């Protein structure tokens, strides 16, 4: 292991360490099932019960496929993409919002570079389409060079992850409508982002992502300050935030839209944007792939919108071995 090249991410409830393009450590997983992981990576279909070694092997295989196919954690990183990988991904929505002018910059995190600012839709998707919860990273010169060549601003040459600083620099660069991703474990920064928004008179769309295993106080911070939140494998988040949402996207791994600003952001992702904007903010709605209600088009996928009390549970939701998601913190 090169201690100057270390990256730590969270995937399937395990902390995964990568150095020099190699997976070097995976902690014990507590999650036993995730419908998205099973859909994206065939090795998760081989898991039976709580076979942790099989789960760890599947986690390693998934991360190694990102390294092999897309150059993750290496100078060979592919950083531009326009394909819509999943129906309700944060990067997919940010890409669409940039294309349609709903935001004029995105503040996101890239391994090897940390927090970056970009107004290039394809770069947002290239970075985020297959990214998991990145908690720590170190500089990779090839990635930083590619990002700068693509017109991105790298906030720290040391590859620090600092979304608050990223938004400040985006404001200083003249951007007025900014979308920012915030990892659930850093939920305390959401309140400070709202203060920035008020202080500078800009619009900041806050996307709370990677929420598996976060504590109840962080869930409450997200409830109070985020515009959209990805529930991941957090059942507590579903129970706490779901009843307060205006819109739920998907049943199995819900994305909750909490504000009018969030609804306007989502409308940029839909072909039927005026329909989304016209929805009654005092009611609750569900987007799902079950043919009930009006058909709408999100990215390259179809969904159906219907009025519904939230949250709506799915038949196959993420599950933990001992029903204690906080064991994964």
Residue ranges and their predicted role:
Residues 1-329:
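Conserved mixed alpha/beta catalytic, RNA-binding, or beta-rich assembly cores of soluble enzyme
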């Amino acid at each position: 292991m090169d201690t100057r090249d270390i990256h730590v991410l969270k995937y399937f409830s395990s902390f995964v360490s990568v150095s020099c393009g190699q997976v070097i450590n995976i902690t014990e997983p507590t999650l036993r099932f995730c419908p998205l992981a099973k859909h994206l990576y065939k090795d998760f279909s081989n898991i039976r019960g709580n076979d942790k070694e099989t789960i760890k092997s599947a986690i390693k295989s998934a991360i190694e496929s990102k390294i092999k196919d897309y150059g993750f954690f290496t100078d060979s990183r592919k950083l531009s993409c326009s394909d819509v990988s999943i129906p309700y991904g944060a990067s997919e929505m940010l890409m669409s919002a940039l294309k349609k002018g709903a935001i004029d910059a995105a503040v996101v995190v890239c391994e090897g570079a940390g927090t970056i600012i970009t107004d290039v839709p394809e770069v947002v998707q290239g970075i985020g389409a297959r990214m998991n919860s990145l908690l720590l990273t170190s500089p990779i010169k090839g990635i930083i060079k590619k990002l700068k060549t693509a017109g991105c601003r790298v906030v720290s040459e040391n590859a620090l992850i600092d979304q608050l600083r990223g938004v400040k620099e985006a404001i200083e660069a003249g951007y007025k409508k900014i979308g920012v991703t915030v990892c659930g474990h850093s939920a305390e920064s959401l309140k400070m982002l709202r203060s920035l928004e008020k202080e500078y008179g800009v619009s900041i769309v806050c996307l709370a992502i990677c929420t598996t295993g976060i504590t109840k106080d962080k869930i409450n911070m997200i409830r109070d300050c985020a515009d959209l939140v990805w529930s991941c494998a957090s059942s507590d988040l579903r129970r706490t935030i779901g009843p307060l949402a205006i819109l739920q996207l998907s049943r199995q791994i819900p994305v909750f839209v909490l504000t009018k600003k969030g609804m306007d952001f989502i409308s940029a992702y839909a072909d039927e944007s005026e329909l989304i904007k016209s929805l009654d903010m005092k009611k609750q709605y569900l987007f799902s792939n079950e043919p009930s209600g009006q058909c709408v088009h999100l990215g390259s996928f179809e969904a159906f919108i219907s009025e519904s009390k939230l949250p709506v549970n799915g038949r196959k939701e993420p599950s933990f071995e001992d029903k204690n998601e906080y064991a994964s913190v």
